[in-house]
């Protein structure tokens, strides 16, 4: 039932043939007047604005928590907002048949699947077209070949495009993964076959870590993309992450819209994307040659991104994967070429030719991803970034020349804990890289996002860093940056940036007046879990004796589980909120297991059992 609802079921051979025939005829070339936007957050805002500029009526589907979102506020009189129901992705945006039923009821001509969720599901594309809906994206056979990462690698091999050594396809289990890892040698990289955005991906340094990491990444991929398939490849330590933006029509006209560098990453999630710079001519030539060969050989249709690893040590290029959809960072290519990629997606879906499209790259563009996250220290004293959903009390993005903002929040917006943490994309264009960096730094000094914590301060630190400004970095860049900056200063500045000075906690906030009892308040919005799994006992119960390091509960937010202890609570200057030389006894457990709690909700009450 779950696979049916998410569109992950196999259609008959006869139906496949019928749908393929339809894809290559009227359904891929139909006129579009009313489009269903199957997206949320920044992506939904981008697609709504593009659709309206294209003269289309919009039907926006949103989950329960997103019904009052900023994208919903962008709708016009003839547009429609329809509730998908549910909170989690599985209950809402991954429910393919609910989306299609809404599309039929609302009488739309097309569905734009956005960037995440089911945007790379060939089954979803087939079902849409079977129901007479123009799926704004490539043919399903393109997604069969390239949307699945393991299939994409096999396709590249067949076309003699170099790939990183790894598994031939999706891995059946951790035992099979172990065999491949032993053959190519550790360290290895486990990756979601249908993934992206830093989800379902992890480095494994040795055999003892493989089984547990395989299970964990499969669950993470299933939760994020509706498919838990994994593949494995050799991990290259010093690399740049490069990608080519491609666009191709039904008539076979191919366009390459430049190269992007996405090497500034944290936990495989891109933070800064920009126009590629200082690449050897030979490397540029290979990137364009391989990308064009790939999309022409598979008869690709629509917008996509071909991603590569640039091994700095060996000065070699390896194909990594292809995204058969738009990327979050597509505005970088738009800013330097002047080509509106969403507009071109609609044009291709109508059957129009791109033969006359002019692509003339000019200048340098750079994008910052602004995420809802707070920075603090883990038990070892290292910096960590924790999702920080909640209500935005103020959001200010001034309109300025050569700056583009795609935002998902405004004053009063609620950032729910069920999805990714992206709240804004800020893109700058300059005549060169130096000017783009200066523009971004100047602009960030006027941006305000209060009520939630964000990575704005970290973004400023990156842009101010000499190594970044000089282009001396690879995908390990942030690890080096963190060793050069003060963690306490970053934490303090981030809290102030979020407007946290007025709302910071002190000892009086967590003490009951005239009592030896203390409060433990939720540090963030999220799902409250008393134990790591249903099979294990609660971490603490009434009567449990604890200290600052004792795990109390787990809070799940934006697909990340965080262990909470008294040590998780800090004052504005980074000191522990609770006395370090005391022990406490839990006297009351207030929160219910698996319930959603808000920041500041009372979770536990405890009493001190040793003197101050």
Residue ranges and their predicted role:
Residues 64, 472-483, 487, 595-612:
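Acidic, glycine-rich catalytic/binding loops that coordinate metals and/or anionic ligands
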Residues 1-158, 171-179, 598:
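ATP-binding N-terminal substructure of ATP-dependent carboxylate-amine bond-forming enzymes
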Residues 502-521:
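PDZ/PDZ-like peptide-tail recognition elements
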Residues 516-612:
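Structured functional modules or segments
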Residues 7-26, 30-45, 49-58, 81-83, ...:
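ATP-dependent carboxylate activation and anion-phosphoryl transfer catalytic cores
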Residues 93-96, 106-174, 180-210, 216-228, ...:
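Hydrophobic, well-structured modules enriched for small/aliphatic residues and gly/pro motifs
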Residues 40-41, 62-66, 86, 115-116, ...:
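Short, ordered loop/turn segments at secondary-structure junctions
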Residues 186, 362-366, 516-518, 524:
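Short structural boundary motif marking the start of a folded domain
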């Amino acid at each position: 039932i779950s696979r049916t609802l998410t569109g992950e079921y196999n259609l008959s051979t006869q139906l496949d043939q019928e749908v393929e025939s339809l894809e290559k005829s009227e359904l891929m070339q139909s006129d579009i007047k009313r489009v269903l936007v199957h997206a949320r957050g920044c992506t939904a805002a981008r697609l709504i604005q593009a659709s309206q500029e294209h003269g289309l009526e919009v039907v926006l589907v949103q989950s329960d928590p997103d019904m009052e979102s900023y994208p919903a506020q962008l709708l016009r009189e003839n547009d429609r907002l329809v509730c998908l129901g549910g909170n989690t992705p599985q209950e809402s945006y991954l429910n393919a048949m609910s989306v299609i039923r809404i599309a039929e009821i609302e009488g739309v001509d097309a569905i734009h699947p956005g960037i995440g969720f089911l945007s790379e599901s060939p089954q979803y594309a087939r079902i849409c077209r079977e129901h007479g809906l123009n799926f704004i994206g490539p043919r399903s056979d393109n997604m069969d070949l390239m949307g699945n990462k393991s299939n994409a690698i096999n396709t590249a091999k067949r076309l003699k495009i170099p790939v990183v050594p790894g598994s031939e396809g999706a891995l059946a289990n951790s035992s099979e993964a172990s065999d491949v890892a032993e053959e190519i040698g550790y360290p290895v990289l486990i990756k979601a076959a249908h993934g992206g955005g830093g989800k379902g991906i992890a480095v494994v340094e040795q055999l003892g870590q493989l089984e547990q990491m395989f299970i964990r990444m499969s669950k993470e991929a299933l939760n994020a993309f509706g498919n838990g398939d994994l593949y494995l490849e050799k991990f290259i330590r010093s690399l740049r992450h490069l990608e080519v933006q491609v666009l191709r029509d039904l008539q076979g006209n191919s366009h390459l819209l430049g190269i992007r560098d996405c090497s500034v990453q944290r936990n495989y999630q891109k933070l800064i994307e920009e126009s590629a710079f200082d690449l050897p001519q030979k490397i540029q030539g290979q990137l364009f040659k391989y990308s064009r060969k790939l999309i022409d050989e598979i008869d690709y249709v629509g917008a996509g991104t071909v991603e590569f690893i640039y091994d700095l040590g060996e000065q070699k290029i390896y194909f990594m994967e292809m995204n058969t959809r738009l990327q979050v960072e597509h505005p970088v290519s738009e800013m330097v070429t002047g080509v509106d990629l969403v507009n071109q997606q609609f044009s291709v879906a109508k059957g129009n030719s791109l033969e006359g499209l002019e692509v003339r790259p000019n200048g340098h563009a750079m994008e910052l991803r602004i995420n809802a996250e707070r920075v603090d220290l883990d038990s070892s004293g290292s910096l960590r970034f924790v999702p920080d959903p909640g209500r935005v009390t103020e959001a200010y993005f001034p309109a300025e020349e050569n700056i583009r903002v795609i935002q998902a929040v405004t004053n009063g917006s609620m950032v729910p804990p069920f999805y990714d943490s992206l709240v804004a994309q800020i893109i700058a264009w300059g005549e060169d890289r130096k000017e783009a960096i200066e523009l971004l730094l100047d602009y960030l000094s006027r941006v305000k996002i209060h009520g939630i914590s964000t990575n704005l301060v970290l973004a400023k630190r990156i842009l101010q860093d000499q190594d970044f400004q000089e282009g001396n970095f690879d995908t390990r860049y942030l690890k080096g940056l963190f060793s050069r900056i003060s963690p306490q200063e970053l934490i303090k500045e981030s809290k102030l940036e979020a407007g946290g000075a007025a709302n910071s906690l002190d000892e009086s906030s967590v003490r009951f007046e005239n009592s030896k009892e203390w409060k433990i308040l939720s540090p963030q919005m999220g799902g409250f879990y008393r134990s790591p799994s249903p099979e294990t006992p609660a971490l603490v119960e009434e009567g449990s004796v604890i200290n600052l390091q004792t795990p109390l509960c787990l809070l799940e937010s934006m697909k990340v589980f965080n262990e909470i202890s008294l040590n998780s609570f800090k004052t504005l200057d980074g000191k522990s909120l609770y006395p370090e030389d005391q022990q406490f006894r839990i006297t009351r457990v207030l929160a219910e297991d698996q319930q959603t709690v808000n920041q500041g909700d009372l979770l536990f009450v405890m009493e001190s059992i040793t003197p101050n």
